[in-house]
Each structure stands twice: as C-alpha cells, then as structure tokens.
A protein has these predicted regions:
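Catalytic cores of nucleophile-dependent amide-cleaving enzymes
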Residues: 472-473, 545-632
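Long, charged/polar, low-complexity intrinsically disordered N-terminal extensions
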Residues: 1-122
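Long, continuous compositionally biased terminal/linker segments
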Residues: 234-280
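A domain-level signal for caspase-like cysteine endopeptidase catalytic cores
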Residues: 327-546
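Caspase-like cysteine protease fold
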Residues: 564-565, 625-750
Length: 750
C-alpha cells in the first residue's frame, strides 16, 4: 500500500504518508483519533486508501479550497468560507500532497485563516477520509533484458500506474507514471507494481520498430503486449488491425479513443457541460459507454472510422521519434507518461546542401548581402553609408566563418570578421531560408551530426536517438530522470540569472530591461556582467531556476573575460535547472549543461543575428514567466520569428519554471471584423500537472461550458470584453498574425 495513515504521536490527528511520492502531511482533529481502515469504494470520488475517524473538526495547516458535493456527486459549492445544512456530503480539499476527500453526514462550516483551513461539524461525527496518490513518480523500476519479447512483458506493466480503468483515466491526475525500466539479466518486478488486467491485448511483431509505437496504447489501455506476425489490437469478440502503417494507425486510435473517453466521462464523476460533447457529430449512448468495461468500450471505439471525427479532435500535444534501438528502451516510461504519439524511424534523413527546406536553408552559407549580419560572418557587401557599421557586429558568435585562422580571432568587445560595412536598416529578422543559397561553409561544426526528422502535425516534437534533430527537442534520459526529482514549483521563490558576457549588448543598455524581464514580478532576477571562467563555473553550479545567457560561444566554449570555458571538459556540477543560451552555435555547450545537471534548455544550431536573438530572448523570457514549458515556448516564438528555427530544445522539453495562473498555457488570437467587433480565440496547451485530458473554462466570457484543451473560438466580441480578458494575466496575443502581449494590448491602441 503506497499511502500510510497513522495517528500523530503528540498532537490530535493523523499523518498521511505517500511512499511513492515521498510526501507527508498532517490532518488535525479536535480529539485523539484512531484511524480505522474502511472501504475506498464508499467514496464517490476514486481513492486508493480510506480510513474512518470520530471527530468534530478536520483542520489542514495550509490554505485550501474546499469543494462540497452531494453523496451522488452533484456540486453544492466550493470556496474557503461557507456553511452547509445537515446532509451527507462528499468533500474535496485541494491543494494537499495527495488527493484528499472526506465523506460525512453532518452540518458543515468551512473557515480559513492565513495559516489553515478548518471544517467544523455540528457534533462529533464519523468521518471517512479517502486519499489518492498523485503518483507523478514511478512506483518502482522493472529490471528487464532488452530483447524485444522481454521488453513486451515490461511494457505490459505500464498500465499498473493507472488509478482507474474508467473513462476518468483521461484526466491526468488519474494516470500515474509508469514504472521505470532498467536493463538487467533477469526480469524483476518491484513490490508496488501490480499487473492490471483490462482484457485488451496488443499483438505486434517482436521488433523494436513495432513495439515502440504502441507503447502509449499499452499504457492507456492497460494492455498486454504479445508477439505475433501482424499488428493488431484485440478484445473479447473484436479485433482491430493496426496495419498498414502501424505508427499512423496506432496514433489515430489513441487520439480517437482518448477523445471519446473525455466526452464519456461527463456521465461519471464530473457531469459538466462539455463543449466537445455538445458539438460532436457522433450520436452515441454515452451513459451506456460509461458503464462498459474498458475492453468492451474500446471495442465500440474501434468501430468508428477515424476520418469521421478527425476534424473534431484537438491538435495533439507531442510526437516523439524513438530510434528502434534497445538502448532507447529506458525512455519508454517517460514517453508513455506524456501520452506522446510515437514513431520509430529505421533510417534518418540528413540535411543536404541542395535540399530546399527551412532546416537546410538556415544551415547554408548566407546570402552575401546578409552575411555580415551574422557575428563572425564575412560580408562582401559594399553598401556603406551613413548607417553603416563594421560587419560582424550584429551576431553572437565569437569567430568568423569556419576555417578562419586563429590569428583572426578578437577579444570580447572587438568586432570580428572583415571591416567592410553593411546597412543597419537591412531586414535581419525575417531572412527567408528558401532564398539563401550556397554550400555548407560557415554555419555548422565539422563534426556535427544533424538529422531531419519527418514533420509532424502535433504542437511539440521530440527526438530520442543519435544526432542533432533539426526542428525537434533532443530528449535525453538523464534530463527525464531529473524531472522525477524536481519538486513542485514554488511561485514565491523563482530565481532568474541573466549573464551578459557581451560588451556590445551591455552598451545597448540594461540587459534586464532589454529582455523585458522586469515585468516578471514574481521572479527574483539578478544580472551579472563580464564573468571570468571561475566566476562562470560558480554561477553554473548555483541553485538557479533559469539561466538566460547572452554572449559568445564557439567550438572552444563559452567566452569569458579571461578565456573560454568549455563545459564538455570541465568537472563542474551544474545547479541550473533550465536555460536559454542565446549565443551562436550554443548546442554543444547546452548539451554539456544537460549532461552535468540541468534539466532542459534552449540552444542555437547556427550563428544568430543580434536583433532577432534579442527579440526571441524577450519572447522566451515572457513565455517562461507565463508558465509555458520549453517546447511550447519555442513553438510560439517560432511562429513570430522565422529565425526561431535556428533554435532547438535539449533535455526535458516539458520543463517549466513556474505554473501558469490559468493552469494550462494559453495563447490568444484576435482580429477585428467589418463591424468593428472582434473575433477571438484561445489556444490552450496542456502543460505540467495540467496535462493531456485537462478541462478548461473561459469564465471571463461568461461561458458555462468546459473545453478539452485546444482552440476555443468566440465571435463578435466588443473591444471591452477583449480588454477584460487581457487584463487577467500577461499572455501572448496575436493580432492579425502579429505578436503583442495582453498588457500592451490594454495600454496601447492596437
């Protein structure tokens, strides 16, 4: 049993310990109590452990919201100060380290102070307390040989993390983290990992390329994975082929079934008005579906053609490409926990000099007219004039084009490249990669191993395997393990460190103001300039939530005032949690930060222009402040700046440094129509604890409906309503396709 309840040794009350999450909290009572085990099924909401106590009060030593329901689950009220008449209630208390519910028959008074939340009953009552682990860390580690058939047995246990087999498992809080995998000579299963039987079986050939794409299905359907000649999913009395194109069909089935579960769950514990239920073209008996066992319900799902509902489905969050190699098996529990779609490419595409694509385009030599805008680039332009400056002064590399002689290198603060001049009025943030030409010369390291993953329709894209992925998050096992060790975000203690080792950037003004970081009021921001190698090592070893680095990087490392610090060769233990290395070709140094202790970061693959790098830095800073994770933040920045394609995420792309006040991350869009009203939409991105399956509600527009995160659109709203929405929180807002921020929209006549 993962949750243990014991009487307090001194005070009156109980201690609740979650051995999986390694958390503990106290519930105080008004008299000594002896918790007696009770049936978890006595609770309306799902719990894993339940006890009864005799008490006149329940007190939690923290501020919380108390939600009261009838015994049948109907909402009565919620808040922190109210009174209920005598009746039988199911009451939830949030937030506490576990899900906490109590069932009581009494009159109830809820009060709060600045330190505690108290429920007082009209008399001493029998109170049933139920608890459910949030279970965001695995119950244990399965030791397994890494041959395909042994791996099938391990993946078959991923469903043991599910808190329920009902449609409510589409809620992120009812899906625990699958057990970890560890290569071993023999197959071993830890004590707390129990096999879950759903009656679903997935049959695939015993090959990594066939096993990896069905991992999220095995987890979500609690399915047994067995070897067979043709890929299919089987239940009692039905069978559904996953051929041809296993990856596509597995992804479609997950999206379809998950969406139908989100609608079906409105017949269960949370009978809300769901927009997707009201607008679906499907005419199904949702109550009947809810009552079915999982395997029988899935049999109904597979009878519905994906094409029939494809247009109704929200854009899925993540696709992960996992190379079909045994060494990548340890990543599978993390991929399943994110409910990522999975592809397993046997071959990889490499960028070529003649390939006409954005990825290849920004890796080529620049057009001569724009080369000087890239720090270290050499310009052949001769358009010097009144607005001209030395070439090479506009980017963040510390070197010229590849192959430049060592004698051509300059100290910090001096221009690099030629002394020819360029026009500073030239457009440098929207260089069309398809208009550049040339061969690979000055942009990528000699030993770079770039790969071009196939495009995906999901918001985010990750890559597991060798190579530097263009346009995808380079995910690593060590970074994902650090996710498990990361504590919950404390809004009041978020540290941001800005390091500026770029003399020219310092001359432009205060770096914090330049990057707009001062409007991140809940952040403790420190700016450091011109660090030596020793000072940089000390900085990187410090306990910092987010490092924003501005300066020079080349093949020798990060430039400091007394030389270069190459993180690939240092023994420093990095304490920085997340980072943006806003310098030219910072990929290898960013990867070294991950290897030495960081969780995730954003890096560059090429030389980057100062102006566009500054703009991107401002965007990323504000998005991280707004609770976006690294992958989604870069996705939004790339929408605004084509040069955002020069950046990728390394490590755990799901890293956040604070929680969004709205739960999910939000991007607004608005355009004025012919009647001077506004068409408005909000795109919600699942994020952190508010993962895939979360519900959202646009209360600012007085909507009673809940939504599955996706794009929510409203039409013909007055400007005053847009202002009201924008005033709630600082978030990105695209006006006619151009990025502004909600605070700017309110203060200016946009």
């Amino acid at each position: 049993m993962s949750i243990e309840i014991e009487p307090l040794p001194v005070d009156d009350g109980i201690t609740v310990t979650d051995h999986i999450e390694q958390t503990q909290f106290v519930i105080y009572t008004d008299r000594p109590v002896t918790p007696e085990p009770s049936d978890p099924d006595d609770h309306y909401f799902p719990v894993g452990t339940a006890v009864t106590v005799e008490t006149g009060t329940i007190e939690i030593p923290r501020l919380a919201v108390v939600s009261s329901h009838t015994a049948d689950g109907d909402m009565v009220t919620q808040g922190d100060d109210y009174t209920l008449p005598f009746g039988r209630y199911s009451i939830g208390i949030d937030p506490v380290p576990t899900k906490c519910y109590l069932t009581v028959e009494a009159a109830v008074t809820v009060t709060t102070t600045d330190r505690s939340t108290r429920l007082e009953f009209d008399d001493c009552r029998t109170v049933s307390l139920g608890f459910r682990s949030l279970h965001q860390v695995p119950a244990g580690t399965i030791g397994t040989p890494t041959d395909p058939e042994s791996l099938m047995g391990a993946v078959s246990l991923f469903g043991s993390a599910l808190q329920t087999l009902s449609p409510e498992r589409s809620f992120p809080t009812l899906r625990g983290h699958p057990p970890l995998l560890e290569p071993a000579e023999t197959f071993t299963v830890p004590e707390h990992v129990d096999s879950t039987t759903s009656g679903v079986q997935i049959v695939v050939p015993p090959e990594y390329r066939s096993i990896y794409p069905i991992v999220p299905l095995a987890y979500y359907f609690a399915a047994d994975v067995v070897p067979g000649s043709s890929a299919r999913i089987v239940g009692d009395g039905w069978e559904h082929s996953l051929e041809p194109d296993l990856e596509r069909r597995a992804g479609e089935l997950l999206r379809l079934s998950f969406h139908l579960d989100c609608i079906t769950r409105t017949e269960g514990l949370y009978p809300v008005d769901l927009h997707e239920r009201e607008t679906t073209s499907l005419d199904l008996d949702w109550e009947r579906l809810y009552e079915m066992p999982l395997a029988e319900r899935l049999g109904e799902h597979v009878s519905i053609p994906f094409e029939r509902v494809a247009s109704e489905l929200p854009r899925w969050t993540l696709t992960t490409d996992v190379r079909p190699h045994p060494e990548n098996a340890e990543m599978l529990p993390f991929i399943a926990a994110e409910l990522s779609l999975v592809r397993s490419p046997e071959t990889v595409n490499r960028p070529t000099a003649t390939e006409q694509s954005p990825a290849a385009g920004f890796l080529r030599s620049p057009d001569p007219a724009t080369a000087g805008l890239l720090r270290g680039g050499t310009s052949t332009a001769s358009n010097a004039g009144s607005n001209s400056v030395p070439a090479g002064a506009f980017t963040r590399g510390a070197r010229g084009s590849r192959g430049v002689d060592e004698s051509d290198r300059q100290p910090v603060g001096e221009p690099t490249g030629s002394e020819e001049s360029i026009d500073v009025d030239a457009e440098i943030t929207s260089i069309d990669p398809d208009e550049t030409s040339g061969t690979f010369t000055g942009f990528i390291p000699d030993d770079a191993d770039f790969v071009c993953p196939e495009p995906t329709d999901t918001v985010e894209h990750a890559w597991v395997g060798e190579g530097v992925p263009l346009g995808a998050n380079k995910a690593t096992l060590e970074a994902y393990h650090r996710r498990l060790k990361a504590g919950s975000v404390d809004q009041s203690r978020i540290s941001v460190l800005v390091v500026c080792n770029d003399e020219q950037m310092r001359e432009e003004g205060n770096v914090a103001e330049l990057y707009g970081l001062r409007d991140m009021v809940q952040f403790d921001i420190e700016v450091r300039y011109d660090l030596t190698r020793e000072e940089m090592e000390t900085t990187l070893a410090s306990d910092v939530d987010f490092l924003h680095y501005i300066g020079h990087v080349d093949e020798r490392g990060m430039q400091c005032t007394d030389g270069y610090l190459d993180l690939r060769g240092t023994s420093v233990e990095v304490g920085v949690d997340a980072f943006l290395l806003n310098a030219c070709q910072s990929y290898e140094q960013g990867e070294a930060l991950i290897h030495r202790g960081s969780r995730g970061g954003i890096v560059t693959l090429t030389d980057v222009a100062n102006s566009s790098a500054t703009r991107l830095g401002r965007i990323i800073a504000r998005l991280m402040n707004s609770g976006f994770n690294l992958r989604t933040a870069l996705h939004v920045a790339q929408r605004e700046l084509i040069t955002g394609n020069q950046y990728i995420v390394v490590g755990d792309g799901g890293t956040t440094i604070c929680q969004n006040r709205s739960g999910v991350a939000l991007v607004f869009e608005a355009e004025q129509n012919a009647d001077d009203d506004w068409n408005f939409s909000a795109r919600a991105f699942p994020n952190g604890p508010y993962g895939v399956g979360t519900m959202t509600c646009m209360t600012a527009i007085s909507m009673q409906n809940y939504y599955i995160p996706g794009k929510i659109s409203f039409f013909d709203l007055p400007r005053s309503k847009i202002n009201e929405i924008a005033s709630l929180e600082m978030l990105p807002l695209f006006i006619d396709g151009q990025l502004v921020w909600t605070d700017e929209f309110i203060s200016e006549d946009v």
